[in-house]
Amino acid sequence: MSDFSSRFCAARRACIARDFAKLNPEQRRGVLTTEGPLLLLAGAGSGKTTVLINRIANLLTYGRGSDCGEVPAGASEDDLAFLENYPAQPTADERRRMRQLCAVEPPAPWQVLAVTFTNKAAKELRERLEAFGIAGAGDIWALTFHSACVRILRRDIDKLGFSNDFTIYDTDDCKRVVKDILKEMDLDEKTFSPREVLAVISKAKDELLSPQDFSKKWAGSGD
């Protein structure tokens, strides 16, 4: 990397970091890391969600700018001097120029997927993103794992030959269906426990077995 490139990248990172000056050093490190996977290990109330929200803000504003070694085509010595001497209280035009110089392939809000475990946590995440003032925050996919997958399936499952108008069954629904099938086949629930039947079906799904493959597997097992 040339002296110009290394200085430009250092100045760019410093300018971006100023947007997150209120965070502590470890939080800021997580926010500014954009390349590759990142694991945050911290206790309750230590600011993990704060890091996540600020990291999304960084990605949407600056893309990979804080963590890459690329210099924009046409970057000049004047641009470098501007970043290295970026004022403490910039004007709106200066701030706009800084963001243009520092941004590297920022994604659109709808390209960001923020997955959490509960509906309550997903709702809080969406509310905090909107309160943060991120443009287009409503388009960010801040969802639970299940709701994210359902949204994808509703949109694209027809490409696999299935209907988009499907119904999701919970555990009780599944047990009821298995019980109905056992009754229809005149099989004793004490011998074929619905819970055990569901466990076998779940294992087959994990192994990506089709109903036909599953039938062949058990037909040859002797059980």
Describe the residue ranges of each PLM region.
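P-loop NTPase Walker
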Residues: 1-163, 168
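ATP-hydrolysis module of ASCE/P-loop NTPase motor domains
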Residues: 34, 117, 137-140, 158-223
